[in-house]
């Protein structure tokens, strides 16, 4: 029916999106989540309750938004070839903008580390900072995340070759590796001898690794949606746009981590 209407009433192949409440609700949830998070960090009592509620609400709104997009593409056939080209372009521009964001972070790091001033003790890491050994937990995390890049590439090739079982195993392995990486990153933060308040080194370290960790969480969410769709037989060897976009995003996360490990952990040690 949708194809019939598009053929008879539309002179273009593009999908005219219906009015949706999810962009507004997600923005509102993010605003409340950010505000309550800042207030919790500054010691306001019971703000963690609002933080938790805002997080649950954000996850719920994202789930419903994913549901609508999946319905439009999988069941209604609104994602034509022209729409898919536009979505691919959007993903590419999004990854490019994220790359520029990380470029600014690395610029800040090298601005301070290549020529440390007197306030830093004229050395890097600054005087009084005990940097994390790059050959301990960071090296293990490096191996884990790069291994996840191998498994996610393996499950993609299994999918396009029609090997559904191999695709499922590879995707589950990737998600498990991502979860382990996130847990180890949290352990690293908990045992670190410096905080984000310890000068420019602490700010650069926690902001860069924390922002990357946030991207790992986003990538894990995308891959989890891909796993759910794979289990629901939504994906085929030639129709898997969202799944492929999630894999591209995950490779971007891998590349950023490799640069981050070499520059901040290894060279900055």
UniProtKB/Swiss-Prot annotation:
Gene3D superfamilies: 1.10.287.70, Cytochrome c oxidase, subunit III, four-helix bundle
Segments traversing the membrane: 24-44, 46-66, 90-110, 132-152, 167-187, 207-227, 247-267
Record key words, sorted: Membrane, Mitochondrion, Mitochondrion inner membrane, Translocase, Transmembrane, Transmembrane helix
EC number, UniProt record: 7.1.1.9
InterPro entries in alphabetical order: Cyt_c/ubiquinol_Oxase_su3, Cyt_c_oxase_su3_dom, Cyt_c_oxidase-like_su3, Cyt_c_oxidase_su3-like_sf, Cyt_c_oxidase_su3_a-hlx
A molecular-function term among this protein's GO annotations: cytochrome-c oxidase activity
GO BP: mitochondrial electron transport, cytochrome c to oxygen
Coiled-coil ranges per UniProt: none
Principal location class: mitochondrion
Cell location: Mitochondrion inner membrane
Classification via Pfam families: COX3
Gene Ontology terms: cellular component: mitochondrial inner membrane
Catalytic activity: 4 Fe(II)-[cytochrome c] + O2 + 8 H(+)(in) = 4 Fe(III)-[cytochrome c] + 2 H2O + 4 H(+)(out)
Keyword Transmembrane helix among UniProt keywords: yes
Keyword match Coiled coil: no
Family: Belongs to the cytochrome c oxidase subunit 3 family.
Function: Component of the cytochrome c oxidase, the last enzyme in the mitochondrial electron transport chain which drives oxidative phosphorylation. The respiratory chain contains 3 multisubunit complexes succinate dehydrogenase (complex II, CII), ubiquinol-cytochrome c oxidoreductase (cytochrome b-c1 complex, complex III, CIII) and cytochrome c oxidase (complex IV, CIV), that cooperate to transfer electrons derived from NADH and succinate to molecular oxygen, creating an electrochemical gradient over the inner membrane that drives transmembrane transport and the ATP synthase.
Subunit text: Component of the cytochrome c oxidase (complex IV, CIV), a multisubunit enzyme composed of a catalytic core of 3 subunits and several supernumerary subunits. The complex exists as a monomer or a dimer and forms supercomplexes (SCs) in the inner mitochondrial membrane with ubiquinol-cytochrome c oxidoreductase (cytochrome b-c1 complex, complex III, CIII).
Protein known as: Cytochrome c oxidase subunit 3
Gene expressing this chain: COXIII
